[in-house]
């Protein structure tokens, strides 16, 4: 184990446990004045107090459980008896000196070739932090050698540099600080920086945010360094290496050019944000981009008119509102012969396929719906048999007429504008009825008396531009999927090369938890809510209880069992 690694592990464990043992408070409007909006390359945000409140983590720490956990935490202490201090710490996390009522956040400090991660937390009582550090030193048997300058205490643990004063604690992690700013400079900047305006993240429990142009600049700089090195190497390498090296150089130059062009529609401070929030009956992950300006507008929304053709027991349904003319215009503008050259493709073949796709999309205007109704395995073969459907709104018969022309001799005719073929007991049909183009696999295109249009998830996605829904309730009724899941995760004890392998207790617990966790889910959907935002939502069977609380309650009995075994 590297020097002071045990200290790092203990510190992280105790800080997290304390964070989940506290309550949260809301910042007043007046306190938000004179704060700095974080426009760093990367920003991380976590509201541990809110997470605890929603998940009920503090319910795990009853008096007896705190005593048990305190015994475990203090068991490695070789000096004074710290069990009572650990008890106080778990009962009142403010004893650590860190303010858990305010969110913690982090950002990237970028300087030349160096990128360092900075984590910031508010300090409530610096003297209590001193005592907390001493406690961790005693438990780990390692001294961190903290140095004090004025009201700043600072120490290093391997490549982790930590400092705190009377109001703020910062942790800086990076192995490459010697090539950019020194740890002292990064720490000084972090300690003296204005308070952060975190209002953009307050609606989330956890959030990650990236400045798109700054991130791309980092990627370009990295590739440019490799390019510079390759040119230097090209000047001295052997003749037989030159061809390969030139190919690599050309590839890097193309990648750099593509990266430079990738941000032309983004404003200078455009940011991409992923925020996760636990709510009653659901977990929501929202992905959004601010500062993106495109000449193409995503105005069309799904009508869901094809759901009446989809079985109520469908495993997966995907739907996208397509403006075919806009897609065709994008294909013609960006997928050019020059683009084919950049990708190293045959330009004539590329132009042919892009032209076919462009013409086909001109015929599409409206919903493009895909449904997988069932998956079965064939006995003895283990081959999946799929029952699926795809339906598309079209404005003319361009696509079906080309199918009949190019599919002659391959496809069988099943009537007017209906073609198909049978392969290994799989019947694939392609046809058109009025303004609907359809493709079925082991299915027939007709309305259902008990269709997916009546499913609960329909109301969640009805105003979207597109979505994908996995109906977990139906998935868990599918014998093939369930048996495949169990075969993958529930390995029995077995012999291999005369060795006996026994599934560990931890593996058994994990497998049991995994299945129970999935069983709590009703459905999962990914929805395009606006031209620049997407939501991934996990919807639980229990719609009243906070989703995080449901999972904490699920894990609770297992955690207590593990704690008891660790204490023995």
Predicted regions and their residues:
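Bacterial N-terminal signal peptides that target proteins for export
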Residues: 2-10
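Hydrophobic helical h-region of N-terminal Sec-dependent signal peptides
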Residues: 11-16
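C-terminal motif of bacterial Sec signal peptides marking the signal peptidase cleavage site
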Residues: 19-23
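Structural boundary/hinge residues at secondary-structure and domain interfaces
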Residues: 25-154, 199-380, 552-568
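Single conserved position on a long alpha-helix in the C-terminal lobe of the eukaryotic protein kinase
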Residues: 44, 94-204, 361-465
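Hydrophobic lipid-interacting interfaces of membrane-associated proteins
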Residues: 49, 174-178, 213-217, 290-294, ...
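Broad, structure-driven detector of short, well-ordered beta-strand segments within folded domains
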Residues: 104-106, 160-166, 261-279, 368-370, ...
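Long, C-terminal catalytic modules of enzymes
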Residues: 452-568
């Amino acid at each position: 184990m590297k020097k002071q690694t045990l200290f790092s592990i203990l510190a992280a464990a105790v800080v997290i446990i304390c964070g989940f043992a506290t309550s949260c408070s809301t910042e007043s409007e007046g306190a938000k004045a004179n704060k700095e909006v974080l426009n760093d390359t990367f920003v991380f945000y976590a509201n541990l107090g809110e997470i605890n409140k929603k998940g009920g983590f503090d319910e795990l720490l009853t008096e007896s459980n705190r005593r048990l956990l305190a015994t475990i935490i203090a068991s490695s202490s070789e000096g004074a008896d710290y069990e009572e201090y650990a008890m106080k710490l778990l009962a009142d996390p403010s004893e650590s000196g860190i303010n858990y009522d305010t969110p913690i956040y982090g950002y990237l400090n970028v300087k030349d070739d160096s990128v360092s991660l900075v984590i910031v937390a508010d300090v409530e009582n610096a003297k209590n932090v001193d005592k907390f550090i001493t406690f961790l030193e005693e438990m780990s048997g390692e001294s961190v050698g903290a140095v004090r300058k004025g009201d700043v205490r600072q120490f290093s643990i391997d490549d982790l540099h930590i400092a705190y004063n009377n109001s703020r604690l910062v942790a800086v992690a990076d192995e490459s600080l010697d090539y950019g700013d020194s740890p002292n400079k990064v720490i000084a900047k972090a300690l003296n920086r204005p308070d952060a305006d975190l209002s953009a993240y307050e609606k989330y429990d956890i959030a990650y945010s990236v400045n798109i142009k700054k991130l791309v600049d980092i990627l370009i700089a990295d590739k440019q360094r490799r390019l510079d090195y390759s040119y230097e190497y090209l000047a001295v390498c052997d003749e037989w290496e030159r061809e390969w090296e030139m190919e690599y150089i050309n590839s890097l130059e193309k990648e750099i050019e593509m990266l430079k062009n990738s941000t032309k529609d983004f404003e200078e401070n455009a940011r991409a944000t992923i925020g996760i929030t636990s709510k009653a009956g659901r977990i929501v992950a929202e992905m959004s981009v601010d500062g993106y300006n495109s000449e193409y507008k995503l105005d069309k929304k799904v009508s869901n008119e094809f759901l009446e053709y989809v079985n109520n027991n469908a495993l997966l349904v995907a739907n996208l509102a397509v403006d075919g003319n806009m897609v065709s215009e994008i294909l013609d503008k960006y997928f050019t012969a020059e683009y084919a050259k950049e990708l190293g493709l045959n330009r004539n073949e590329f132009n042919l396929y892009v032209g076919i796709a462009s013409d086909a999309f001109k015929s599409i205007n409206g919903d493009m719906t895909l449904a997988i109704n069932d998956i079965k395995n064939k006995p003895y073969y283990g081959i999946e048999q799929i029952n699926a459907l795809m339906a598309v709104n079209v404005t003319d018969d361009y696509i079906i007429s080309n199918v009949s022309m190019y599919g002659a001799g391959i496809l069988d005719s099943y009537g007017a504008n209906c073609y198909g073929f049978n392969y290994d007991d799989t019947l694939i049909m392609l046809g058109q009825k009025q303004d609907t183009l359809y493709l079925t696999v082991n299915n027939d295109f007709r309305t259902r008396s008990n269709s997916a249009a009546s499913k609960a998830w329909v109301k969640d996605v009805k105003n979207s531009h597109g979505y994908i829904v996995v109906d977990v309730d139906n998935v868990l009724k599918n014998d093939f999927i369930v048996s495949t899941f169990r075969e993958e995760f529930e390995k029995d004890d077995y012999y291999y090369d005369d060795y006996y392998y026994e599934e560990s207790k931890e593996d058994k617990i994990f497998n049991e938890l995994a299945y129970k966790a999935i069983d709590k889910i009703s459905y999962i959907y990914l929805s395009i809510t606006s031209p620049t935002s997407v939501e991934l939502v996990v919807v639980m069977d229990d719609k009243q209880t906070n989703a995080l609380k449901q999972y904490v309650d699920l894990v609770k009995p297992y955690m207590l069992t593990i704690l008891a075994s660790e204490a023995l």
